Amino acid sequence: MTYFVLFLSLCFVLGGLAVASNPSPYYGVVGLVLASVVGCGWLLSLGVSFVSLVLFMVYLGGMLVVFVYSVALAADPFPEAWGDWRVVGYGVSFVGVLVMGLVIGGFIGCLNFGVVTVDSVGMFSVRLDFSGVAMFYSCGVGMFLVAGWGLLLTLFVVLELVRGLSRGAIRAV
């Protein structure tokens, strides 16, 4: 199980790198789908089944609509591929930043790795994902407002990610 979680975390990082160093909006969609599927599988392996399902539906339902909109506005006649030197340079620099962050975090001592599942306390504990559903309906107004602002911010981030070096998705239509 530990190797499976490590494999999922490696795939999640690779999906994030694919989104961050996308040469074209078409490839950014592939990285987003990979990162969302692997991230939800990671949560599912840790016992958070409901939150995993909700995030999977939000990511593939909402974010793919944003990417389709962005691809329609910022379509390139000749999209770059993964093998271009600029894209490889972006990927290598992102991996370098990630490795340096892990090294510095290891020296400072702020990295504590461990896997704890949701229902590892015992029989009398309440699963956290089911109590999260109750929080949606009891005092979740502020949480919904924060989530809405986060999704709006994510929309603008994705629109800027797909624009490339030329005029992109945020322009006068």
From Swiss-Prot:
EC numbers on record: 7.1.1.2
Major subcellular site: mitochondrion
Superkingdom as given in the UniProt entry: Eukaryota
Keywords, sorted A to Z: Electron transport, Membrane, Mitochondrion, NAD, Respiratory chain, Translocase, Transmembrane, Transmembrane helix, Transport, Ubiquinone
Subcellular location: Mitochondrion membrane
Membrane-crossing residue ranges in chain numbering: 1-21, 27-47, 48-68, 91-111, 139-159
Catalytic activity as recorded in UniProt: a ubiquinone + NADH + 5 H(+)(in) = a ubiquinol + NAD(+) + 4 H(+)(out)
Molecular function terms, GO-annotated: NADH dehydrogenase (ubiquinone) activity
GO cellular component assignments: mitochondrial membrane
Function: Core subunit of the mitochondrial membrane respiratory chain NADH dehydrogenase (Complex I) that is believed to belong to the minimal assembly required for catalysis. Complex I functions in the transfer of electrons from NADH to the respiratory chain. The immediate electron acceptor for the enzyme is believed to be ubiquinone.
Similarity-based family: Belongs to the complex I subunit 6 family.
Protein name as it appears in the record: NADH-ubiquinone oxidoreductase chain 6
Gene: MT-ND6
